[in-house]
Amino acid sequence: MPDPNSGNVAWVLVSAALVLFMTPGLAFFYGGMDRTRNVLNMLMMNFYCVLVIPVLWVLVGFSLSQNPFGNDWIGNLDAFMLDGIGLGDNGGTLAVVAYLGMFAAITPALISGAVADRMKFSAWAIFVPVWSLLVYVPIFKWVFGGWLFQRGSLDFAGGTAIHVNAGIAALAAVLVLGKRRGWPQEGHPPHSMPLVMIGTGILWFGWFGFNAGSALGANGQAAQAFMNTFLAAAAAGLAWILIEWKRDGHPTNLGAASGIVAGLVAITPAAGFVSGASPIWIGLIAGAACCYAVRLKNRYGFDDALDVVGVHFVGGLVGSLLIGFFADPDFFAGVVAPFREGLFYGGNLRLLGEQALANGVAIVWSFALTFGIMILLKKTIGVRVEVEAEATGLDLALHGETAYHSGGLH
């Protein structure tokens, strides 16, 4: 934290709480989209991430991903179990550790939507910490202070490190896991749109901490990121329902919710670097791109159950690349970057090139290692539930409980 005064520390702590609140929001969002017999499994997959990742983060994650005394590729273990981190800076470092730990927790949770309805919870329990250490931590280091950042790529709050990373990992995971029984012949509509909309509202609320909190202070850049987050989400949701209205004859609640999330994803990498009407354009472009991208799974036959690839991978990639066009050098605050001008603000292709390189590296690393982790799990403990469990539902088969009891209605 550049200036750990009481106001800045307080804002980062509040932002950390907002980001934590996003995980149950994501659980509701995914849970509502899932089927009644699997909704508790989806909730558990999300909440498991906030059980195991904070412990892993304090043990080694923060030290490996953020320690400045490592190198441009990986940190070291000097801050193992927060060794040496005290209150000498008014608690500023502890606040940042907590804040970034919330990011680490929600990132693997994003992947859960792609593998819905058929992944063993035992495999998920191993996948989450292993993936976080081998995939998330290195990419986070490279993007935020490591060699990709030193080259000049920009990522304000995690478009590349979180959304592109988790989105392409979701694709690798479903390619190993295989399709759900009956997909795509059988439709799998959301079982509860009210849950989806509640989850969307919670995500939108929490995302202000996700993006504005990444300024690491209560300052002008935080206000800028806050406003950009608000505008991009609205524009993307609008773009999605307008496309639906024209194409299908009606706007849907699911389309509005998906569009809002797509806009939130897309503005994440750019929130602190763009100004004026730029977030509206980013939202409109991302909303349209993701609206069409979610249909690619049917064309190419990969069963991304809850559209993680179409929304998070595509949305994050679009938002990150658009920095190369919309970055405004007058709105970088204290961010030191080799390239600050987008093409529309007097820049050249160098920033766009660095954005493309950073995302390309993240895509290759994340896909390859995720695929390898899933293959290893498949050959050892197995990754897919038995046919009977998939048919009866993962809630009863894996957790011994159900979300809805008919007896409770009497």
What is the predicted function of each stretch?
Residues 1-410:
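Glycine- and aromatic-enriched membrane alpha-helices
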